């Protein structure tokens, strides 16, 4: 008992006190003696703690942009011989370039801190891979940090999250921000050396780290006696090439390092000389750098303030006599190459476009026509070098600026007159006008495929050029997931225009056509519409080309969740099944990706396209709270966000790429019904593999898509379709039940429609309230063939067996509540012991609930998921209760229990341990008189799962061939009763038939085969051979939970006893004068109580309520309680508490479990009587 109290006190200290370290040190030996529970090894395997350095090495893409080779990338490099920039294909590991860039930008940043800096040197040794960066100007202070107790350079270069840039109230125009920088280079290096001179105190500092910053030598600090030595800083490192999957520095890597050195030489002020391997970089400022891309005669250069240097050129241009297509964006912020642009590029580009647009519009000759901004932007190449105050970037790789324009710290004033003159003289205006006019002309000469063929497809927004010979290939059909996604796409067309983009919304999921022929597929309305919209024909399956279609490309706009991935897959499968050549054409099918969630803090906004990407970021994000908004459905995005997405189409579009027959095999495996065994193996494999979430790729093979996004859908689909062995529930059922258990008592009634809304809100459910309504109703149905132990009460019309429950009343008119047996199945004492899930930052339902009997065997289940299906029949609750009793008593349970359905009057026959025959009930009513002319047949029960209305359709066809004199139905709400009166002479053969023959003739027999597939306690899919195996696994989990419950109950009883004892002792000491309340302050009293062995509030401690874990329960007692009468009451309460503790100490899991089983069995019996 004493140890447990110490442990609770330790937990309190950890959460509230700065004395944590001391407490931990003093109690380490005690903690080591605490026995592990049965969950310890499982928890250790599942949860790991990594140091910051280990996390950087384990997840490098979060910090440095990835270590894998990026192949065949088009990069503009310097041609030193001809003094110009040229586009070249290179292959390189981006992370290696990033760690070099961190050191280079650090050196360049020193110019902003010390204007006297005038030299930066980079040395690169190809053979040893040793790189050094040296700069003059003020070095780092060579002093001991007063708080950390180590030298400042050691702190800055060898400890993550250290920076001089954290104070956002101080205006800075440097590249560093988050305290990673040079430390990342240190972590990814075999050797890392820092040397700096601080002439203020005449000290030189040198320190060496190695083995990925895991080890370092002592800092060498020497006094400088030479007065001529100036301040400098030098960083020298040898990158750990193995971590970048290379063994030496390739020509491409060396060229890219040289490019960055050259870029810094161009972006730094002109008074800073930059050298590479002793050779001065031959560039005279940013304007000179821009001229290396383009003839200076066709270049506009704007330099309104020292913080803004902007070059503008036509994208299609000439360098001398050579035609070149210039890069769309070349931009730098505080010497950082922002390769993907960002808010600074948008800011400058919009100002330039606003000047050029009116000029173009005036020359079009038609006041009703206007050039789209996107057309102008596509004709411009823009070069920017700017200084931004305290910049924010999309990620640590700093490729995209996210700072809002109002926070730039300066304004770019675009010279309108100079810009307009340049646009005219360079021929830009003429080029744009010609392009716009040609667009219009292209509508006329081509022959249009019949427009009337699609005019009746009401929801189609057809592209203006769709079906026109010569232009249709350029058209893209955006296929959206429903009407809300269509609205998003239409907002995007404001940016893209309607000439080449059409939109068509799909009604949910497309049909899986894998096992359909042309005729059957074309009968589907959705597929028929797509054939007409796209201009597809089944007979052209081998010869069809993009040029022959109405649209040359498909762009799928679906939700960013798993169901969205499934929709993409079904569309891919549709095209692949009938026109594989189109799938083999790269770029015919594209996917549009939107953020799954956004994080916002002040002006900063971060977008994430997958939970994996978000988690990596969240793991390392430091400081401040971010507001998270989830975009589970496309309808969540606003029209402004839609325009933002479509303005950056390249970033939001993913091309499907065909890489060979493995892609064909992957598509067939995912969708062909004959490939179920392969899908099972695929799913098994996925449980042990990390799937490829959207990692920012703009191109993906079909196999990557199947093994990544589709695999994730498969796992989610299985979890929706197949229940947990532990509670017998699927996720939606569990969310519904937990909402009621956690928020309402058994007597509370709630409208079904309101309950669905509450579940969606409280349990983070995103699949529509209609789906929840259907599940709630099923959970409350009591007719034969539904649940043996319904978890909810059906208050109102929840449907009957005649329609299989589909005749339930509207959710607005019916109510529900917990069924009387539900709390007996799920004891409230377990609620706080269950492991809760967290979704969207909110604590929701547990991973599984834990009933006192395996509910899956009582209520059964049925479900079909990806690759796997499950079917388990209902069984008698009393039989299952008896089986668990036998296991408690260690009596063998290696036997099968036959299926059982409440109120079923037919027969269930066992064929094999997993196969059963369900027979209805038929009665031959023989005539009482020998000469009677008629006799009757009555059908009074149907096989399990056969509903009355469906059977009536079948029966009607049977009796059509019989001499029926009368056919009547006498059903009640719960009973089936068909009566057929036949002519005796014409139907005498029936009088000779056995009951078995009659059952067969009237199709009153069905087979039921069990396929016992369930998720186990760890969430892994498992197939069980018999129900004893299911019961055995359930038993272990339930027993462990009882032991955990009893342990906690004992601790609570101890806490209650200590609470009363302490109050009693306190009152006694106050009344006898041992404690003088009046002469001491609160702090003195608390210290006194601690010295005397009083505990802080034991009830608050065990409840982990740190705010109340103090001495308030003693010191804040009213004076009226400090009496002998109160002491008597407390003595009585103490006696009761001691009795409760003794009962808790003597209780064992077997007796508690038996007691709860008895109560459940009694309730089941009472239900049957009623």
UniProtKB/Swiss-Prot annotation:
Domain (Toprim): residue spans on this chain: 475-590
List of residues binding Mg(2+) 2: 559, 561
Annotated family: Belongs to the type II topoisomerase family.
Entry's EC annotation: 5.6.2.2
Gene3D superfamilies in the record: 3.30.1360.40, 3.30.1490.30, 3.30.230.10, 3.40.50.670, Histidine kinase-like ATPase, C-terminal domain (3.30.565.10), Topoisomerase II, domain 5 (3.90.199.10), Topoisomerase, domain 3 (1.10.268.10)
Annotated site residue numbers, Important for DNA bending: 864
Site (Interaction with DNA): 509, 512, 679-680, 730, 765, 771
Domain annotation Topo IIA-type catalytic: ranges: 722-1157
UniProt cross-references to CDD domains, sorted A to Z: HATPase_TopII-like (cd16930), TOP4c (cd00187), TopoIIA_Trans_ScTopoIIA (cd03481), TOPRIM_TopoIIA (cd03365)
Chief location: mitochondrion
Protein name in UniProt: Putative DNA topoisomerase 2, mitochondrial
Catalytic activity: ATP-dependent breakage, passage and rejoining of double-stranded DNA
Keyword Ligase: no
Binding site for Mg(2+) 1: 481, 559
Site (Transition state stabilizer) location in chain: 812
GO process terms (BP): DNA topological change; resolution of meiotic recombination intermediates; sister chromatid segregation
List of catalytic residues: 813 (o-(5'-phospho-dna)-tyrosine intermediate)
Enzyme class of the recorded protein, top EC level: isomerase
PANTHER family, alphabetized: DNA TOPOISOMERASE 2, DNA TOPOISOMERASE/GYRASE
């Amino acid at each position: 008992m004493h140890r447990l109290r110490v442990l609770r006190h330790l937990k309190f200290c950890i959460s509230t006190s700065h004395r944590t370290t001391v407490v931990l040190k003093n109690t380490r030996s005690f903690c080591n003696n605490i026995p592990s529970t049965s969950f310890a090894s499982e928890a250790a395997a599942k949860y790991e703690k990594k140091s910051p350095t280990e996390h950087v090495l384990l997840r490098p893409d979060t910090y440095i942009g990835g270590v894998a080779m990026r192949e065949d990338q088009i990069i503009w490099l310097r041609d030193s011989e001809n003094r110009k920039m040229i586009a070249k294909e290179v292959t390189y590991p981006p992370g290696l370039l990033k760690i070099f860039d961190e050191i280079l930008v650090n050196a360049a940043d020193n110019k902003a801190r010390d204007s006297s800096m005038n030299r930066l040197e980079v040395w690169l040794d190809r053979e040893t891979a040793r790189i050094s960066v040296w700069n003059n100007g003020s070095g780092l202070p060579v002093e001991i940090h007063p708080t950390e107790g180590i030298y400042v350079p050691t702190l800055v270069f060898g400890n993550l999250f250290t920076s001089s840039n954290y104070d956002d109230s101080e205006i800075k125009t440097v590249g560093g921000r988050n305290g990673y920088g040079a430390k990342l280079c240190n972590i990814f290096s075999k050797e890392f050396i820092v040397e700096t001179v601080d002439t203020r105190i005449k000290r030189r500092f040198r320190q060496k780290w190695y083995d990925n910053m895991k080890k370092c030598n002592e800092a060498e600090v020497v006094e400088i006696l030479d007065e001529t030595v100036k301040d400098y800083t030098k960083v020298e490192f040898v990158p750990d090439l193995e971590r970048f999957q290379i063994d030496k520095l390739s020509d491409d890597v060396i060229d890219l390092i040289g490019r960055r050195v050259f870029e810094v030489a161009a972006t730094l002020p002109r008074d800073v000389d930059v050298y590479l391997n002793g050779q001065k970089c031959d560039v005279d400022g940013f304007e000179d750098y821009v001229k290396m891309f383009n003839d200076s005669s066709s270049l506009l250069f704007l330099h309104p303030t020292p913080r803004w240097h902007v070059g503008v050129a036509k994208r299609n241009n000439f360098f001398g006599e050579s035609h070149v297509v210039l890069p769309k964006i070349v931009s730098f912020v505080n010497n950082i190459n922002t390769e993907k642009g960002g808010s600074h590029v948008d800011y400058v580009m919009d100002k330039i476009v606003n000047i050029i647009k009116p000029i173009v519009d005036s020359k079009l000759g038609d006041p009703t026509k206007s050039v789209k901004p996107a057309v102008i932007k596509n004709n411009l190449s823009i070069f920017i070098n700017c200084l931004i105050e305290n910049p924010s970037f999309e990620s640590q790789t700093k490729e995209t600026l996210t700072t809002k324009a109002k926070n730039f710290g300066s304004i770019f004033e675009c010279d309108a007159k100079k810009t307009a003159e340049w646009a005219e003289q360079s021929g830009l205006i003429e080029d744009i006008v010609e392009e716009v006019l040609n667009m219009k002309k292209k509508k006329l000469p081509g022959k249009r495929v019949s427009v009337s063929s699609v005019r009746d497809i009401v929801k189609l927004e057809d592209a203006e050029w769709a079906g026109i010979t010569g232009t249709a290939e350029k058209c893209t059909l955006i296929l959206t997931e429903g009407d809300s996604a269509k609205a998003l796409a239409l907002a995007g067309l404001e940016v893209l225009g309607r000439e080449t983009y059409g939109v068509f919304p799909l009604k949910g999921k497309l049909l899986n056509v894998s096992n359909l022929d042309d005729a059957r597929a074309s009968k589907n309305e959705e597929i028929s519409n797509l054939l007409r919209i796209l201009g597809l024909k089944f007979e052209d399956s081998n010869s069809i080309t993009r040029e022959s279609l109405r649209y040359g490309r498909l762009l799928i706009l679906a939700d960013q969740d798993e169901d969205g991935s499934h929709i993409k897959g079904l569309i891919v499968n549709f095209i692949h099944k009938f026109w594989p050549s189109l799938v083999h054409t790269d770029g015919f099918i594209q996917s549009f990706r939107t953020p799954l969630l956004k994080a916002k803090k002040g002006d900063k906004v971060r977008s994430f396209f997958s939970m994996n990407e978000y988690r990596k970021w969240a793991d390392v994000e430091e400081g401040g709270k971010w507001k998270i908004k989830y975009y589970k459905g496309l309808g969540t995005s606003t029209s402004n966000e839609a325009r933002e997405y479509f303005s950056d189409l390249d970033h939001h579009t993913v091309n499907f790429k065909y890489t060979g027959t493995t892609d064909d095999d992957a598509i067939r495996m995912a969708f062909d019904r004959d490939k179920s065994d392969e899908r099972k193996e695929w799913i098994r494999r996925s449980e042990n593999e990390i799937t490829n979430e959207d990692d920012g790729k703009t191109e993906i093979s079909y196999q990557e898509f199947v093994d990544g996004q589709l695999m994730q859908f498969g796992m989610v689909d299985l979890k929706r379709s197949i229940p947990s062995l532990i509670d017998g529930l699927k996720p939606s059922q569990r969310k519904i039940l937990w909402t009621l258990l956690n928020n309402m008592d058994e007597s509370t009634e709630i409208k079904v429609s309101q309950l669905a809304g509450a579940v969606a809100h409280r349990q983070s459910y995103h699949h529509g309230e209609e789906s929840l309504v259907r599940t709630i109703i099923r959970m409350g149905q009591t007719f034969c063939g539904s649940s043996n132990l319904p978890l909810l009460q059906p208050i109102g019309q929840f449907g009957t067996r005649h329609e299989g429950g589909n005749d339930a009343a509207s959710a607005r008119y019916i109510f529900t509540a917990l069924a009387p047996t539900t709390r007996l199945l799920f004891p409230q004492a377990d609620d706080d012991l269950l492991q809760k899930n967290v979704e969207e930052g909110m604590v929701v339902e547990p991973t599984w609930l834990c009933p006192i009997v395996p509910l899956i065997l009582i209520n059964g289940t049925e479900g079909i998921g990806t690759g796997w299906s499950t079917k388990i029949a209902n069984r008698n609750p009393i039989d299952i209760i008896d089986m668990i009793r036998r296991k408690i008593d260690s009596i063998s349970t290696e036997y099968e229990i036959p299926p059982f359905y409440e109120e079923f009057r037919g027969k269930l026959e066992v064929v094999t341990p997993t196969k059963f025959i369900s027979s209805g009930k038929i009665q031959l009513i023989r005539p009482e008189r020998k000469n009677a002319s008629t006799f009757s047949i009555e059908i009074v029960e149907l096989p399990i799962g056969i509903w009355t209305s469906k059977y009536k359709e079948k029966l009607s066809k049977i009796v059509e061939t019989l001499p029926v004199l009368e056919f009547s139905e006498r059903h009640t709400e719960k009973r089936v009763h068909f009566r057929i009166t036949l002519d005796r002479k014409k139907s005498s053969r029936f009088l000779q038939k056995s009951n078995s023959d009659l059952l067969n003739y009237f199709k009153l027999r069905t087979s039921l085969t069990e396929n016992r597939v369930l998720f186990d306690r760890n969430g892994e899919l498992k197939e069980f051979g018999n129900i004893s195996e299911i019961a055995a696994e359930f038993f272990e989990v339930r027993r462990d939970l009882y032991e955990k419950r009893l342990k906690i109950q004992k601790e609570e009883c101890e806490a209650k006893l200590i609470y009363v004892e302490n109050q009693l002792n306190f009152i006694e000491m106050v009344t006898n004068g041992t404690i003088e309340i009046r002469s001491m302050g609160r702090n003195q009293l608390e210290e006194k109580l601690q010295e005397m062995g009083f505990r802080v509030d034991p009830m608050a401690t065990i409840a982990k309520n740190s705010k109340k874990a103090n001495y308030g329960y003693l010191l804040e007692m009213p004076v009226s309680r400090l009496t002998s009468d109160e002491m008597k009451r407390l003595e009585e309460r103490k006696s009761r508490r001691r009795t409760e503790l003794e009962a808790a100490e003597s209780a064992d899991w077997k007796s508690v479990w038996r007691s709860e089983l008895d109560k459940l069995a009694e309730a089941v019996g009472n239900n049957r009587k009623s």
